[in-house]
Amino acid sequence: NVGKSTLMNHLIGQKIAITSKKPQTTRNRIQTVYTCEKGQIVFLDTPGIHKAKNKLGEYMVAVAERTLKEVDAIMWLVEPSTFIGAGERHIAEQLQGVGVPVILIINKIDTVKKEEILPAIDTYRKICDFAEIIPCSALRGQNTEDIIDSILKYLPYGPMFYDEDTVTDQPQRQIVRSEERRVGKE
């Protein structure tokens, strides 16, 4: 669990996406909207790309892979590690030919020593050509404004898709149901 939903919730300032310590908590694509004076960002929080072990896993990976073709920029969230496994290499290969800027977000920097962050950046830089690499802590809000500024640089100019009060395409009932499901499992 690299903290995609935690980051989305922090960036828009509301708890929309379910967060959990378990990986693959996000099962469907969740759209959230961030609006500021500089522009509007529509985030698509997808299930993580992983090696599927069953039909649900295959569905979740397909949702994530389809989304790669619909966006103006991609944020790839990882943890601060110098170990690159087969899963990360697979994702890096998929991202090489997408034709849009890929921003690497190294999340959870609050869980490692500062000296460990640069080696993690160097490790990831070797496997993919990133437009930018931003270390952050979604939980603590460290460097999250840098993420917003970075994304805004890559978005095309045009009208806003949503009014400034919209934060998600999820109906309130779905958000409550998701929260009830999460609370019921803890």
Predicted regions and their residues:
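Conserved, well-folded catalytic cores of nucleic-acid-processing
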Residues: Q14, V33-E37, A52, T67-I74, ...
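Conserved nucleotide-binding/hydrolysis micro-motifs of P-loop NTPases
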Residues: P23-T25, P47-H50, P80-I84, I109-V112, ...
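Canonical P-loop GTPase G-domain recognition
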Residues: D110-T168
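Conserved small/polar residues in nucleotide/adenosyl-binding loops
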Residues: E180-E186
